[in-house]
């Protein structure tokens, strides 16, 4: 760094050529931007270890150790990158939007279209799933729709999905809602006055005449703490944190609208899909997820229903974010919406908290060119 600054000073003092000075400044700036781009993209590339080449979720959900090992590797790299606080302003989180059936260039590979409510659940590697609903034609929001239990899923941690108590926004899937009778047990207020129902078993037994309302659960009773953990219980896989949006109804309860309760859009680096990226052209919001200036016209999914131009959109979105253009964080849910010919395209978001601050391009250039161009910082 000192040698580079000495070279710039030498050009200013002895060359007397403004063209040479500008050329050298441009070369130094290009080098700084390229180095910063490598720093920022490294954690996202390590997400490929977590999300690459698997149908619709994290590796290791079958009880293996690959997910935990990959998480440790990603955390290790993030901590290494976060140690050097070069500038005060920067990014504390790096978020990668998963476009429908897309490859985020070399960051997240082999995104699969996957809907467990369809039979068949989709063709891996394609932009949209094929299949038809089973029993319930109105999609996953149809009341009392029985979820399909995954095979060899790990058990729920004691205390629910969130340590220290139930999930925010409602009960965990598989648990009874407040005011409803528990599966296989009496009502919250105790048994009905007068004892058990005539001609039927006592409270706590099966309902007379067959299974209780809501339909049977494949494989037996509904999931309970210590039982199978369904994919709908991972809101950060399905849709990621959704800022300022209420919870959405899912089978057995309500998923929280946000995982940790806070998102700071200014400190999140977004990499999104679409022909211009979900954040719009160069991350400015123009022609973004919600169309031309938010009107819905020329929106990303309508321009690119099959994800063909998603890598181009990722490039423009990354380039815009690199220079400080950033739109508010916008997360697209997996299920529903107007994405794809069947409306069931796989989209979402993954966020990596680097545990520190990765310096921004503006801060790097301000430190590099100060005091010559200190106004950049």
Curated annotation (Swiss-Prot):
Tissue specificity note: Specifically expressed in the ejaculatory bulb and seminal fluid. Detected in mated females 3 minutes after the start of mating, and for at least 3 hours after the start of mating.
Keyword Signal tagged: yes
Top-rank taxon, per record: Eukaryota
Biased composition (Pro residues): 165-228
Keywords, in A-Z order: Behavior, Secreted, Signal
A single Gene Ontology CC term: extracellular space
Subcellular location: Secreted
Ranges where the record places region Disordered: 155-253
Residues annotated as signal peptide: 1-20
GO biological process: mating plug formation; sexual reproduction
Task performed by this protein: Major protein component of the posterior mating plug. Accessory gland proteins constitute, or are required for formation of the anterior mating plug. Posterior mating plug forms before sperm transfer and the anterior mating plug is formed after the start of mating.
Name of this chain's protein: Ejaculatory bulb-specific protein 1
Native organism: Drosophila melanogaster (Fruit fly)
Gene it is expressed from: Ebp
